[in-house]
Amino acid sequence: MAVFTAVSDSDLAQWMRHYELGDVLAFRGIPSGIENSNFFLTTTRGEYVLTIFEKLTAQQLPFYLDLMRHLAAHGVPVPDPIPRDDGALFGELHGKPAAIVTKLDGAAELAPGVEHCIEVGQMLARLHLAGRDYPRNQPNLRSLPWWQENVPAIVPFITDAQRALLEGELAHQAGFFASDDYAALPAGPCHCDLFRDNVLFAHAAPGTGHDVRLGGFFDFYFAGCDKWLFDVAVTVNDWCVDLATGVLDVARADALLRAYQTVRPFTAEERRHWSDMLRAGAYRFWVSRLYDFYLPRAAEMLKPHDPGHFERILRERIAHTPALPEIQTACN
């Protein structure tokens, strides 16, 4: 969520004429992230986020915005796109598609504990089930075909050892994706980027027995139809790791995965390929971070992520992956 496209006061005034959101009180760019131009927008009607989509096209965008509306209608806390005066959920700003969505309450928890992971696991499973009847179908655009297309451009910048890992894991994942077991994995709309900074928490209401309350999931602009287990793996690889080493925190991982299973139990195929999918989740972000680090775009406020973080996670997942935890039922 860096700012690649600047928006002046006059640009904003012209844009806001298409919305019934009152008068603008504050407007500022959001410096984190690397994909779209994002701005916090405060008006006399409330708080919002304006996003200018730097890569997504007008043809692709309805999948994401309609998905957010669909999930919200099914009780999943996500930003709600605001219709324009013509009823459309997005328009054009500086020749690029742009939209306004509601701003969720709460703050990111960058040092999550077990209780945070329980909340995330349960809500991720609810998101997956809520998306089962979503009518649009668009693949995860950062999956195997994207890796195969972009790895050759990265290779000249990295060491021989990194190249061996990058190309070897690509071959491993290509084989996994071609397998019958992979085809049998449950699938549907996925967030595909559910990192700690894409989830908000607020204080729980008194008397609920909980210290935290999940405020919502946001930044759905990497979402796509994929295997649900991939979404779980991406989430675990961020929420349940030691950030210095990439080693899984067993207590947090166990809490998140057990909580997920209380809503949607894992299948036998998912249990069999948990290690492969954790590796796929790590590989996806190692490739994209290498690409953004060595082949960056110009931006006003760009903070590229360290590619080494997901290299460490990938190496660790290849070496050590615990099995998915079982959940106890009345029949056990």
UniProtKB/Swiss-Prot annotation:
- Tell me one GO biological process term: threonine biosynthetic process
Give the reaction(s) catalysed: L-homoserine + ATP = O-phospho-L-homoserine + ADP + H(+)
State what protein this is by name.
Homoserine kinase
| InterPro entries in UniProt | Aminoglycoside_PTrfase, Homoserine_kinase_II, Kinase-like_dom_sf, Pseudomonas-type_ThrB
Pfam families according to UniProt: APH (PF01636)
What the record says about family reads:
Belongs to the pseudomonas-type ThrB family.
Q: EC top class, in one word?
A: transferase
Coiled-coil ranges from the UniProt annotation:
none
